[in-house]
Amino acid sequence: MLIAQRPTLTEESLNPQRSRFTIEPLEPGFGYTLGNSLRRTLLSSIPGAAVTSVRISGALHEFTTLPGVQEDVTEILLNIKGIVLTSEYDEPVVMYLRKSGKGEAVAGDITPPAGVTIANPEQHIATLADDGELEIEFTVERGRGYVPAQMNKQDNDEIGRIPVDSIYSPVLKVSYKVEATRVEQRTDFDKLILDVETKPAISPRDAVASAGSTLVELFGLCRELNAQAEGVEVGPAPVAEETNPEMAVPIEDLNLTQRSYNCLKREGIHTIGELVSHTEQDLLDIRNFGMKSIDEVKEKLQTLGLSLKSSPMAFDTNNLEGGTFFSPEDE
């Protein structure tokens, strides 16, 4: 069986609701195959919760107004569609909003049952005057994708129940691009960059994980045709060479002198793990980084039980004969 190199997936968090995922290296052509499948699944098949119908006290249908309420019922329904929900229940549940007196009615004024969470409590629903009263009963259900109000209408609905367009999908935007990446001497491998933006109801990381789980289940149907059929096997995940948690500690924690610290940061060395991957000669090649700085770094690392990377060409400058060793700090 052919064995392909296992791709790696990394996440770059741009904000709590947007992340950029990079998957590489992929066999030529698989960037578009995987990217298109993930995008379509993320936009259409991630489960979520939404309001499916409402009952508004004093309103028999959406083409009416309420006394003491600035917005008409149609505008109130549009605002209700903007409520972002999560629900632990597979069956429909009910929540209520009761508001009176002058002020703004927002999603945070709704009283949801246990297991239902409103992710954007600041969502505006209506504006009430001094004599305004607003009482709404919401029906919340779980689903996928988008369901128009007509499909949420039931034949046995009581008079006054108004169906609402349901936007179940917790994913707002998905885009991807494919770039070339290099593996040894080959430069035709794919690098997939997937940009995902979600509602507060779910994180981009969980959304991508859900999409991946869905695709695995669906593609597994094809494998069931012949479980012994030969395909391309993905190699094992690479084993990390260093699992010491101190490798991720920033070099600021070493309390180096300002000169040494500035030299390392200018060279792009930000963590202890990056520092110990360099040899003494690597550091000496940094401008204004001399033996005093080397000794300081070695002393700080020694307190952590660490050391710089050894070099086969290392030599002891203290034993040089017939010459004088010069470092920038001797200036």
Curated annotation (Swiss-Prot):
Keyword Ligase: no
Database matches in InterPro entries: DNA-dir_RNA_pol_insert, DNA-dir_RNA_pol_RpoA/D/Rpb3, DNA-dir_RpoA, RBP11-like, RNAP_asu_C, RNApol_insert_sf
Top-level enzyme category: transferase
Domain of life: Bacteria
A GO CC annotation given for this chain: cytoplasm
CDD domains the record matches: RNAP_alpha_NTD (cd06928)
Leader sequence segment: none
Pfam family, one: RNA_pol_L
Region annotation (Alpha N-terminal domain (alpha-NTD)) ranges: 1-226
SUPFAM superfamilies hit by this protein: C-terminal domain of RNA polymerase alpha subunit, Insert subdomain of RNA polymerase alpha subunit, RBP11-like subunits of RNA polymerase
Coiled coil location: none
Keywords, alphabetical: DNA-directed RNA polymerase, Nucleotidyltransferase, Transcription, Transferase
SMART domains attached to this UniProt entry: RPOLD
E.C. no: 2.7.7.6
Keyword Ligase: no
Catalytic activity: RNA(n) + a ribonucleoside 5'-triphosphate = RNA(n+1) + diphosphate
Any one Gene Ontology molecular-function term assigned to this protein's record: DNA-directed RNA polymerase activity
Family listed: Belongs to the RNA polymerase alpha chain family.
HAMAP family xref list: RNApol_bact_RpoA
Comment text on domains: The N-terminal domain is essential for RNAP assembly and basal transcription, whereas the C-terminal domain is involved in interaction with transcriptional regulators and with upstream promoter elements.
Quaternary context: Homodimer. The RNAP catalytic core consists of 2 alpha, 1 beta, 1 beta' and 1 omega subunit. When a sigma factor is associated with the core the holoenzyme is formed, which can initiate transcription.
Function: DNA-dependent RNA polymerase catalyzes the transcription of DNA into RNA using the four ribonucleoside triphosphates as substrates.
Protein name: DNA-directed RNA polymerase subunit alpha
Taxonomic lineage: Bacteria, Bacillati, Actinomycetota, Actinomycetes, Bifidobacteriales
Annotated gene: rpoA
